[in-house]
């Protein structure tokens, strides 16, 4: 039996080849926003977004509007948005009493003819113990990371 004690565990991890030229780096929030909207508009099979939350502000509305526009153009498009459940239940800290983003998600869903479901994922029992803070996005066979 071979002793793998001094070998890197990464040598045996599942993997697939990735050419360096297939990786692009975006510099700045505006470049990320434009690429995100471009990928949403161009997706043909699937869009999976994970984020801490989508805020009821200009940026959040722009993303959700783009998702619904893509779904309207391609009704078979599989769209799923995953956000932290606890974070969606409250508004911005210091902004006074707010219903939270979950209320906005529900209202938006009820007023749209298209479906782009937003799932709240309760990672912990309370927000202070940890949140869903993944920043990965899948568009067909393209992966986009943020942060």
Regions found by a protein language model. Name each.
Residues 53:
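Gly/serine-rich nucleotide phosphate-binding loop at the start of the catalytic core
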Residues 5-42, 57-147:
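HKD-type phospholipase D/PLD-like phosphodiesterase module
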